[in-house]
Amino acid sequence: MGESVLSRLGQWISNTPLRSLDQAYEAALRIKAIEDQYFQGGSIGSNGQHGQNVSRYFQIQLRRQLRQIDLRLAEFRASSAFSRLPDPEQNGSGPTSAQDKAQQLHAAEANVSESSSENSENGRQRRDLSILEKLQFIDQVTSRYKRPTRKSQPISASISTSPEPLERPEQPTSTQPSSSNVSVKAGSGNGAAPVASKAAILPRSILRTASQIRRELSSQAEEELIQEYREARTRTLVSIRFLLLLAILPLLTQILSKNFLFGPLVDHLQQREPAIVALSHEFQEKALTEFEFFKERMEFERALHHQSPEWDLESADQLSMKAEELLKKYSRRNSEGLKNILADLLSLLVFGWLIFVGREEIEVLKSFLDRLIYGLSDSAKAFIIILFTDVFVGYHSPHGWEVLLGNLAAHLGVPENRDFIYGFIATFPVFLDTLFKYWIFRYLNRVSPSSVATYRAMND
């Protein structure tokens, strides 16, 4: 029985990549069916034949299917690293001609919304397609909707929509003329010479202004502006969603794994094998110190009441109860630290998995942060820099570091080491202050000199 369960579990894990790819392929088929049935094969929302409520319904369905495709493809990429995939060109006995493949796709698209009795036949047709064919079909369907979230789009969009300070590092005058001269020499004919002379004579700001006026007078200016706003909104939504995932998912993993996985496991081991979760040397010293203080206080009270210095049965029972109480107290602290360490490691693995899977979202997040930071005024940038430097490396920062390290030691279940805390406070803020100054001198002074001037004026 146990072997059959393990074999089924192993088979389910090994089939996870293909199952995720099939689910993403089904979502792409649903989008394609809506396009063919209601939009004559065009993109959803491209024509104005439908009313506002109908268009809104189709947009909701589109976003739902695109979200399903993103999640299943991310699951496909993550599970492919741990499972062995079949040959991408030999995944089943599929059709060999392009006409048969087209007929098969058409049949699957036509039956995508049929009842559950026909789902097995559609599933067989989908399995007949190879992995590359499914991925190609998904890319073909989502290409017109997923452009803002591609890896190259956020970079180009962020460069085109970023403020002026981002372009300053790309304006050295010593290398630009040489590259233009090389292009003139490499070209054939005399048509490139006026272009080089024009670029050398006229400032770039005039050329940018002329191109901006030409874009504004274009007949497609409104559509381009709307498209830019849509792309900016998409980048913002993707960035906020990814930040929430990075913050919430590891935190939930830490809490749930500690309370429902590692907590019962450590408690069971502690009850069964107490030596596995034994008290550390520091906790033993603290328990003995507290026990000696309790014992001396009892002797002091007995001396005040002129009682016999010999211990009676009641006093011995009190000492025994106090020893058991101290043992439970420090054993709980020791086991809580072990639970926190295991849960923190698991949440760190989840965080690393999110970073590995969401590489495209990281590119979008970079462009979003660039627009957000460089869109601030110089005084706002200087205020943020002063706030961070004063909090982490300022005059009152040692007290904050001391509290932070003390809470970290309690979280890990280890006693506070004052020598380590004082040594850390004496070295790490100094290194952090040097890093801040180097960043301001090397990067911020080159990108936004006005912010550096404002920062120095406010700091003085």
From Swiss-Prot:
The gene is pxcA. The keyword Cell membrane applies. Residues 107-120, 171-184 have a biased composition (Low complexity). Residues 90-102, 151-163 have a biased composition (Polar residues). It is found in: Cell inner membrane. GO terms for molecular function: proton transmembrane transporter activity. The keyword Lyase does not apply. Required for H(+) efflux immediately after light irradiation to form a rapid H(+) concentration gradient across the thylakoid membranes. Together with PxcL, contributes to transient H(+) uptake following dark to light transition. Keywords: Cell inner membrane, Cell membrane, Hydrogen ion transport, Ion transport, Membrane, Transmembrane, Transmembrane helix, Transport. The chain crosses the membrane at residues 242-262, 337-357, 373-393, 420-440. Residues 82-128, 143-190 are annotated as: Disordered. Pfam families: CemA (PF03040). GO terms for cellular component: plasma membrane. It is a multi-pass membrane protein. PANTHER family: CHLOROPLAST ENVELOPE MEMBRANE PROTEIN (PTHR33650:SF2), CHLOROPLAST ENVELOPE MEMBRANE PROTEIN-RELATED (PTHR33650). Belongs to the CemA family. This is Proton extrusion protein PxcA. InterPro entries: CemA (IPR004282). It comes from Synechococcus sp. (strain JA-2-3B'a(2-13)).
